[in-house]
Amino acid sequence: MPELPEVEVVRRGLDAHVTGKAITAVRVHHPRAVRRHEAGPADLTARLLGMRITGTGRRGKYLWLTLDGGDEPLARRAESSVALVVHLGMSGQMLLGPIPKEDHLRIAALLDDGTALSFVDQRTFGGWLLADLVTVDGTDVPVPVAHVARDPLDPRFDRDAVVKVLRGKHSEIKRQLLDQTVVSGIGNIYADEALWRAKVNGARLAESLTKPKLAEILDHAADVMRDALGQGGTSFDSLYVNVNGESGYFDRSLDAYGREGEPCRRCGAIMRREKFMNRSSFYCPRCQPRPRVRRA
């Protein structure tokens, strides 16, 4: 699943190419892609026509385009506090360029300068919906995103406040890093990378870690995601691409994730993989020893 860096790469690409442009045509090729828009495909299509894209936003793994009524009458401009929310799911792609002729095209839109915007999604977990914007903690976000915490790359991210929350959690630190209501955007890959950099096993209880160590983990999470962003994100297959259809290459720089059986880049011990929450965790048994189980 695309994590924060991959979604931010897509947001930046869209921001540079679609902001200020009006939507002139929309076609939903598969109803599942708009299942989260409760009023249905016809409503979404009708409301999008003529709307102008005024900007882009992101919170964690959620992406949206802010909209207004463009050149429509004032009555239509009441939609100015609306956003087109895009969830990429496991394999969603927002592509600019000729509309692709392929089986996984779910939605296609045309803009007033002739630009085509396509939503391609092989596994169909992603989709589009229109949602009202609400102000949460001084920031306008779509209603479906209102519950999502700020992410470590957000300028208003309060690291100390998150550390305080983590100190009160009687559960594994990795589980908390993946909880989007605590801190958003840190998915499985970047959680493993941050924990490796901090020399902390993901099975450690959050409450057992000191405030400085928790702050260090969050700082590493921010750093590794900035590093990934600089390399276009992480692509293990062709499913994650930017708006031009290009893959990221941060997978070549990963220190933990996907490196089972390989030597730790820091100490040389053989990296291990364990099952965790229907996922896999990768860690160094020497640098990141598992917590001891207390016997009764």
Curated annotation (Swiss-Prot):
Query: What cofactor is this protein dependent on?
Result: Zn(2+)
What does the record say about how the cofactor binds?
Binds 1 zinc ion per subunit.
Q: What is the lineage of its organism?
A: Bacteria, Bacillati, Actinomycetota, Actinomycetes, Mycobacteriales
Q: Where is the active site?
A: P2 (schiff-base intermediate with dna), E3 (proton donor), K61 (proton donor), R279 (proton donor)
* UniProt family annotation: Belongs to the FPG family.
Q: What is its EC number?
A: 3.2.2.23, 4.2.99.18
Keywords in UniProt for this one? DNA damage, DNA repair, DNA-binding, Glycosidase, Hydrolase, Lyase, Metal-binding, Multifunctional enzyme, Zinc, Zinc-finger
Domain of life, per UniProt, equals Bacteria
**What does the entry list as the binding residues for DNA?**
H104, R123, K169
Organism field: Mycobacterium sp. (strain JLS)
Signal sequence bounds: none
Q: Main role?
A: Involved in base excision repair of DNA damaged by oxidation or by mutagenic agents. Acts as a DNA glycosylase that recognizes and removes damaged bases. Has a preference for oxidized purines, such as 7,8-dihydro-8-oxoguanine (8-oxoG). Has AP (apurinic/apyrimidinic) lyase activity and introduces nicks in the DNA strand. Cleaves the DNA backbone by beta-delta elimination to generate a single-strand break at the site of the removed base with both 3'- and 5'-phosphates.
| Catalytic reactions of this protein | Hydrolysis of DNA containing ring-opened 7-methylguanine residues, releasing 2,6-diamino-4-hydroxy-5-(N-methyl)formamidopyrimidine; 2'-deoxyribonucleotide-(2'-deoxyribose 5'-phosphate)-2'-deoxyribonucleotide-DNA = a 3'-end 2'-deoxyribonucleotide-(2,3-dehydro-2,3-deoxyribose 5'-phosphate)-DNA + a 5'-end 5'-phospho-2'-deoxyribonucleoside-DNA + H(+)
Q: Which gene encodes it?
A: mutM
Q: What is this protein called in UniProt?
A: Formamidopyrimidine-DNA glycosylase
